[in-house]
């Protein structure tokens, strides 16, 4: 259910405290206590932010390693990739800033975009705004192990080969 996005937790309804995305145990506890949007397994919805904690916590409980350490040990190091979940301080200056997407006035809004704009309680809106003031261009964000949206790479071509 986690890998196919049917766990029912694509976003958190419970308000995330400021800085909450940087506290692994806090985020796991929120997810453990969250009421699913649907009965797990019955529907799908993209778990863009939450998937990192859901998968990462399984990895931590099975291996004892954090998501970033596991990824480094099992993927980045063996394949000699510049790819991190939790960027080392030594690499921070290599990161390009993310620029938000700005649709053209001719673009027809997707169902996701329509829900995001019109329903403040939708999973679409909550998944992108209930983030504890997460800033994807902050150095602390680069260093955090936020698996759903925190992977940083210079090795995409190697991953796809």
Briefly describe each language-model feature range.
Residues 1-160:
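Short, surface-exposed loop or secondary-structure junction motifs
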């Amino acid at each position: 259910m986690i890998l196919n996005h049917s766990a029912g937790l694509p976003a958190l309804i419970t308000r995330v405290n400021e800085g909450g995305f940087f506290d692994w145990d806090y985020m796991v506890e929120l997810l453990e206590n969250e009421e699913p949007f649907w009965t797990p397994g019955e529907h799908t919805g993209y778990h863009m932010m939450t998937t990192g904690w859901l998968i990462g916590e399984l990895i931590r409980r099975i291996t004892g390693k954090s998501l970033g350490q596991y990824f480094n040990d099992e993927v980045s190091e063996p394949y000699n990739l510049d790819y991190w979940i939790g960027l080392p301080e030594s690499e921070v200056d290599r990161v390009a800033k993310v620029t938000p997407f700005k649709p053209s006035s001719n673009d027809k809004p997707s169902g996701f975009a329509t829900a995001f704009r019109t329903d403040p309680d939708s999973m679409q809106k909550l998944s992108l705004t209930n983030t504890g003031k997460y800033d994807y261009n902050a150095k602390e964000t680069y260093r955090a192990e936020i698996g759903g949206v925190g992977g940083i790479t210079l090795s995409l071509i190697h991953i796809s080969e």
